Regions:
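Interhelical loop/hinge segments that connect adjacent transmembrane helices in multipass membrane
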Residues: 1-9, 195-239, 279-295, 415-429
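Membrane-interface junctions at transmembrane-helix termini in multi-pass inner-membrane proteins
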Residues: 14, 71-80, 132-158, 173, ...
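Transmembrane helical elements of multi-pass membrane transporters/channels
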Residues: 16-31, 159, 163, 180-199, ...
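Alpha-helical transmembrane segments of multi-pass membrane transport and lipid-handling proteins
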Residues: 25, 29, 70, 89-115, ...
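Hydrophobic alpha-helical transmembrane segments
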Residues: 51, 120-127, 153-203, 262, ...
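Hydrophobic transmembrane helix module of multi-pass membrane transport proteins
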Residues: 61, 90-233, 240
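Helix-loop junctions and terminal segments of transmembrane helices
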Residues: 62-80, 144-145, 261, 265-301, ...
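Transmembrane alpha-helical segments of multi-pass transport proteins
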Residues: 102, 373-377, 397, 424-480
């Protein structure tokens, strides 16, 4: 054990992870601190335009570089990694050039046909945003290859400072909503420039290439553009579907309210979810070879679901009050979106790490098909909800439909490793009912006596009961 720990510290693995994780936390903290100022400078419709813009850029970015950048850290020989960097950079520049050409000739026509006319004044920012976002993604993969983990960490902090600084400065001088869009572009540009400076300083970008190395690299990692790219596109389309759908059928205000609720409610997932997912993959792979994957996954599912369901739903019930105080009175309606989204978001905190079982169990093809199914069901939910001509109700139906499919996917993958589906559904139902029972009285008090001291006491008691009961339950079952 001592030898192992020495090797770990010698390789600086823990040090590198702490750089990235710590920087991500600092960057998120900066975003949260600045958000109350931005929410008072910009309107919900301004944030709606930003959301639609970032959705379009995010989807297009999945095509850039043909996804070869994901293979940069993989080759053992440096010459093949450099060949991949060259290929993905050239493909990225060609794709962005094509976007500029399309924007010039048919950009306005396409945006009008897909009901995104709100982006027409900012048409040329779309390919520019794809350029800086793709450049940062490629630069980050090269930095991982070169071990520039401290640089990656600092660029995330720099992105938060420069991006939010640009949004504040441009908003104060009345550049709305352009300030939000330019701030997003500035953030990505600052990140990639920092990594490129570190690479130039180390002289790791000075190299020669051969056609043979390029050809071998392209052929060996051809699955990235053939399969991985389309999986990523489907995933990103599913993630951004509500924003685009709300902009199609309702208003930019609805998009802004939804985006604010979803982003704030998903903060625990963005901060904790990625770290939990990485740990789960490492421990799950080990458990697979030990023959304990089923018991480990069941315990992980029970713990993560319990620790996410009650806190996130409780936070969502308080969202109308918290958003009005934290963001300003114009954002109170965003709290309603948080309430209807809460079951889906709470389950997503468990769902995201558990989906790593597809990779651990070698079920990549099933994951692809299930991702398509989830996207189609989410689209159906939004479309059916639109029949009532109410954006909040549309989001509610979307949330419930998504929740059902996510539960089905987890039941499927857990049953595939030896856990009965009935048992998975029983655990899920019991955790949902536990949260509902603990939050029933606090919700009633909040609805009718939200200014009473007794309401505060009821919420505190509910939280104490949740902590004590689950600590006792987990200790009794030897889960902790």
């Amino acid at each position: 054990m001592k030898i192992f720990l020495k090797k770990v510290f010698k390789r600086n693995i823990i040090k590198n992870m702490s750089y990235v994780a710590g920087a991500s936390f600092v960057a998120q903290s900066i975003n949260i601190i600045i958000l109350p100022l931005l929410s008072r400078i910009y309107s919900p419709s301004d944030f709606g335009i930003l959301s639609v813009y970032t959705s379009v850029v995010g989807i297009l970015t999945m095509f850039t570089g043909l996804r070869y950048y994901l293979a940069i850290p993989l080759p053992k020989q440096e010459k093949y990694a450099r060949a991949l960097l060259y290929v993905t950079s050239v493909a990225h520049c060609v794709f962005v050039f094509m976007l500029f050409v399309f924007a010039y000739f048919v950009g306005d026509y396409i945006l009008d046909k897909i009901r995104l006319s709100s982006l027409q004044p900012y048409l040329y920012l779309i390919p520019f945003g794809v350029f800086v976002t793709g450049a940062y993604t490629i630069a980050t993969q090269w930095a991982v290859r070169e071990g520039f983990f401290s640089t990656i960490g600092w660029t995330r902090i720099l992105q938060a400072i420069c991006g939010n600084g640009a949004k504040l400065a441009l908003g104060i001088v009345g550049c709305k909503p352009m300030g939000l869009l330019l701030g997003a572009v500035v953030a990505q540009g600052c990140g990639s420039s920092g990594i490129f400076r570190a690479s130039i300083k180390k002289k790791s970008l000075k190299f020669t290439l051969s056609r043979t190395d390029i050809k071998r690299s392209v052929i060996k990692y051809r699955n990235f553009p053939i399969y991985d790219m389309w999986t990523a596109v489907i995933n990103v389309v599913g993630q951004n579907m509500p924003q685009l759908f709300l902009s199609f059928y309702y208003s930019l205000n609805a998009v802004g309210f939804y985006t604010m609720a979803a982003s704030l409610l998903s903060l625990p997932i963005s901060i904790v979810g990625a770290a939990v997912g990485q740990v789960f993959v490492q421990r799950g792979a080990q458990a697979k070879y030990d023959g304990t994957l089923a018991s480990f996954s069941e315990k992980a599912y029970r713990i993560m679901l319990t620790l996410s369901m009650y806190p996130i739903i409780a936070l969502s019930l308080l969202a109308p009050i918290l958003f009005s105080f934290f963001l300003g009175t114009q954002w109170e309606k965003s709290g309603l979106y948080a309430i209807v989204l809460s079951p889906k978001v709470a389950y997503s905190m468990t769902y995201s790490p558990l989906c790593m079982l597809y990779a651990i169990g070698g079920r990549i093809k099933q994951s692809f098909y299930h991702e398509i199914l989830l996207t189609l069901v989410m689209l159906c939910g939004l479309y059916l909800g639109s029949s009532w001509n109410n954006p909040t109700f549309s989001v509610l139906v979307y949330s419930l439909f998504s929740l059902v499919i996510m539960i089905w996917r987890i039941a499927y993958i857990l049953s595939d490793i030896g856990i009965e589906r009935y048992k998975v559904l029983r655990i899920t139902f019991s955790v949902f009912m536990e949260a509902a029972c603990l939050l029933f009285l606090p919700s009633i008090m909040l609805l009718f006596y939200h200014k009473s001291l007794y309401t505060v006491l009821v919420w505190i008691v509910s939280g104490i009961i949740f902590v004590c009961y689950n600590y006792y339950k987990f200790c009794k079952r030897h889960i902790l």
